[in-house]
Amino acid sequence: MIDLAIGSSINWSPQVKQLNLFSLPFLTPDAKGLDALIKGEVGRDLFAILDKQGVIPLAFGENGFRELSNSRQAIKAPADLKGMKIRIVGSPIFIDAFTALGANPTQMSWADAQPALATKAVDGQENPLAVFSIAKLHTLGQSHLTLWGYMADPLIFVVSKTVWAKWSEADRQAVRASAQQAAAENLVAARQGISPGDDALLQAIAKNGVTITRLTPQQRKVFQDATRPVYDKWAAVIGKDLVKKAEAAIAAAK
């Protein structure tokens, strides 16, 4: 049994279908919209759902917005992705989204993905920018990076209810406070170097010879429209009321 965990909304979505909310393509354009979800009523609703899964949810962190890289060309429109083999995580909604964009989504572990990128067995991948930098993907031929912000992946801090029941109230409060502090620091770290007024990480990536393409709102909408059937399909799986509540929260945050 695991006592405490920090999990990705992507990794836990097979067990908790509502967590696919964050993987809806182009749900929120920026961190402000994500904050409106994880710090508002939607976040509380998701915590209530998680509470029924045998865990006590403590805090939301962030793994980052997943951006797109490849070894072939700049991606500015869905047509640029046609036929490209893109390594994705093993999630059905990702398969649907990249298939809708004309790509060839390829599921594989991250350990297998890196040599596959190096040999060009796959053309590209999608991950938070911190992963791109830490893994030095520019050395694996990933010379083009597209900032499209198609989904953000929150982290969730939880503790087993079995363990929680054994703790005193003082211990519970201490663990909750520690988790919330760690999550707050994680949110800051996840956005460092890639935010307006602080693009040091992006500059470092560009200095390594990577061509960075930042989609305009108009270009992003073309991708959004192309994946709308996927969005609607998965909204029904997640729960349309929850999705509508999320959309309203994001709109209010603009």
Where are these regions (language model features)?
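N-terminal secretory/targeting leader peptides
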Residues: 1-33, 41-44, 48-254
